[in-house]
Amino acid sequence: MAKFLKYGRVVILLQGRFAGKKAVIVKSSEDGTKDRKFGHVLVAGVERSPKKVTKRMGSKKIQKRTSVKPFIKYVNLNHIMPTRYSVKELCDFKELVKEDKIKNNAKSEVRDTLKKVFVEKYRTINPEEKSASHTKFFFSKLRF
């Protein structure tokens, strides 16, 4: 059977604190590892998505409303739902989110760098690009 939970795939988390939030697969381990003996993925996602901005808003308000709060988490394969979207071009997640950094309690530093990258990418979405709809979907709030 083909593996479809690959790097860059957008997934929706189904269980836990971040249930209903969108995330991107950074690393997939379908057979498990020594630490986690079950199939799991390392995801980087958006905990708080940016809000709508209008022309009448000032620059400070726009800065505040376009902020993104990211998260990093290991998730069991049973607790994710893959989508048809893929955002490999968003940034190089493998360089930003490394497992040794997460294990060495540098998770907050990784989260800060992710926040900077996510905010910068969100503010510079080009609607003419082919992958713009994928990026727009990733940063939008899931309505249900």
UniProtKB/Swiss-Prot annotation:
Source organism superkingdom: Eukaryota
Subcellular location: Cytoplasm
GO cellular component, one term: ribosome
Gene Ontology terms describing biological process: translation
Keywords of this entry: Cytoplasm, Ribonucleoprotein, Ribosomal protein
GO molecular function term, any single one: structural constituent of ribosome
InterPro entries in UniProt: Ribosomal_eL27, Ribosomal_eL27_KOW, Ribosomal_eL27_sf, Translation_prot_SH3-like_sf
Family of this protein: Belongs to the eukaryotic ribosomal protein eL27 family.
Name of the protein this chain belongs to: Large ribosomal subunit protein eL27
Organism annotation: Tetrahymena thermophila
